Design a protein with these regions (language model features):
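ATP/NTP phosphate-donor binding region
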Residues: 1-23, 28-35, 39, 67-70
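Short glycine-rich anion-binding loops that position phosphate/pyrophosphate groups of nucleotides
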Residues: 25-28, 50-53, 104, 171-172
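Short, well-ordered alpha-helical microsegments
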Residues: 29-30, 107, 249
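Short glycine-/acidic-enriched loop or helix-start segments at secondary-structure transitions
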Residues: 31-34, 57-58, 109, 177-178, ...
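Catalytic core of DAGKc-family lipid kinases
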Residues: 39-46, 51-161
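Glycine-rich phosphate/pyrophosphate-binding beta-alpha loops
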Residues: 103, 107, 165-180, 246
Length: 265
């Protein structure tokens, strides 16, 4: 039987209201929400996290336990408003949504390497997907070079000649549970940008130590920006990802804002 997805309204009967439930990881959720992009943004979407990272679930307070997540969904009576990242890339006229992060440089290269790993699926079956991710970090870390970027926000421009990691996020987590911006809030209509400069291994290790203690802001090589609209220009081609889905390797001129979507949990 066909079911028509409907925009949410307070006067609708909750017991008969149709809900699309996504089962999968962050990449699956990314693909579904972008498939719904042309439709009414008031159509609610539900989600049961079954992936290896499940950063969206962490970021919005949805249980990563399948049974508990289902219980959250069943007892819900109205959807929650979550701000997603809306990105527009001028060079290729590309438009999309991300529920977690959009990154270029190191994190995108790590994601690409992990996705190429022949051991990823096998490790995920035993809930050891993080081992594949760690292996990719070690492999990519020494190969990733610094690259120039221009950041534009609030009428100001910031130039980084040797960016190493550049990530736009709407909640605290990336990389399967790393709290890179503890203050990021997916219910606020702002995006957070992190830029880490290319530095030597000893300074990187110190930055990782600070990151584990959530004191990364003390490093002068760690830069955090927040705004309702951020533009990033990179003239040197870099690997780009959105929610762990590789968008390609290219130069970009990308503008990031937020778009409110309804989630049922």
């Amino acid at each position: 039987a066909e079911t028509t997805l409907l925009p949410w309204s307070e006067d609708l009967d909750v017991s008969t209201f149709p809900i699309l439930v996504v089962l999968g990881g962050d990449g699956t959720l990314h693909n579904v929400i972008n498939s719904l992009l042309p439709y009414d943004s008031a159509i609610p979407l539900s989600y049961i996290p079954c992936g290896s990272g499940n950063d969206f679930a962490r970021g919005v307070g949805l249980s990563r336990n399948i049974d508990k997540a289902l219980h959250q969904i069943l007892r819900t009576r109205r959807p929650k408003e979550i701000q997603t990242i809306h990105y527009v890339e001028a060079n290729q006229e590309e438009i999309g949504l991300a529920t977690n992060n959009v990154g270029l440089g190191l994190d995108a290269a790590i994601v690409e390497k992990t996705n190429e790993s022949s051991s990823k699926k096998a490790l995920n079956k035993f809930k050891l997907g993080s081992l594949s991710y760690i292996s990719s970090i070690i492999h990519v870390f020494f190969k990733q070079k610094g690259f120039p970027i221009l950041v534009e926000m609030n009428g100001k421009q910031y130039t980084f000649n040797r960016a190493f990691l550049c990530t736009v996020t709407n909640h605290p987590y990336f990389g399967g549970g790393v709290s890179i911006i503890p203050t990021a809030n997916p219910r606020k209509a702002v995006v957070d940008l992190v830029v880490v400069e290319r530095i030597n291994i000893f300074k990187i290790l110190w930055l990782i130590f600070l990151l584990l203690r959530q004191k990364q802001g003390k490093s002068k090589h760690f830069h955090h920006f927040q705004s309702s609209k951020i533009r990033i220009v990179s003239t040197i081609p870099q690997t780009i990802h959105a929610d762990g889905e590789i968008l390609g390797k290219r130069s970009i001129d990308m503008v990031y804002t937020t778009q409110k979507r309804l989630f049922w949990f």
